[in-house]
Amino acid sequence: MSQRKSVAQIFRRPYCQSVAVRFTILGSGSAGNCSHLETDETRVLVDAGFSPRETRRRLAGIGRAPENLSAILITHEHSDHISGLAGLAGKLRIPVYCNRATKEEIERILETRNLEFRLFVTGDSFEIGDLTVDTFAIPHDAQDPVGFIIHSSVGRFGFATDLGHVTKLVLDRIRTANFLVLESNHDVKMLQDCPRRPWSLKQRILSRHGHLSNEAAADATAEILSGELRQLYLGHLSRDCNTPELAFTVMQRRLQQLAANHVSLALTAQDQPCPTLEL
């Protein structure tokens, strides 16, 4: 089996060619989720799960500031996806895109007086600057959780984290992604044996509206694998019930079995951003 190509090998640009899109996962996990996608015209966050101060710090690390954001997209209302929303979007008047059920739950949880909501119906598509955003339903224990496919001039970015199982609809949507963030939350045995998780929480995580295991993520990837997918990020890894090495090994083994050498595999982290992908 030939050695898997690195991100740099797959996305190396001709010398002096300008960068059309930059993508950075600022952090992913149960303590906060946030990704930054930018073009020449548009800069968006997908989720705002870190405090405003921490979000600003992580953006500064990639040479960016929240004042320049065009929008914040919200997948669902759990705290690890919205904890920084009011302080960022409210203070800076950044439009917040979500569906009505998520908005109503956010209004119950946060002070939203200064938030400018722009509502979509799950399943709809809309434009933000030069980006087109497709939305789709995902199975999770939130009011109306969604995933996104974001179309740019250089490819499609998919986001499917926080889902208990992968429906046909989810498969159909993420199959179109060139760059995909997919949940690989836990190892089932580690979760079952974890002394820090009460049985009720274990049941929730393992349910069809909980979180994807490493094996479930690998199974989903096998279902969608095609020439479209070029970069796969493993997201929302549990600190107590998974390890980066285990999540990576399970997915890498599956990709090798499928001879998917065209796919570059990367881990996300809770404590620091991933390297920026420049396209």
Regions flagged by a language model, labelled:
Residues 46-49, 69-77, 97-100, 158-161, ...:
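Active-site neighborhood of phospho(di)ester-bond hydrolases with catalytic His/Asp-centered motifs
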Residues 52-98:
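Active-site metal-binding motif and surrounding structural segment of the metallo-beta-lactamase
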Residues 100-147, 151-154:
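Metallo-beta-lactamase
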Residues 10-62, 146-161, 179:
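Conserved beta-strand hairpin/beta-sheet module of binuclear metal-dependent hydrolase folds
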Residues 31, 79-82, 103-105, 142-143, ...:
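Active-site environment of divalent metal-dependent phosphoester hydrolases
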Residues 168-269:
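Cap/insert and terminal regions of metallo-dependent hydrolase folds
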Residues 24-34, 75-85, 107, 123, ...:
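Structured catalytic core of nucleotide-sugar glycosyltransferases
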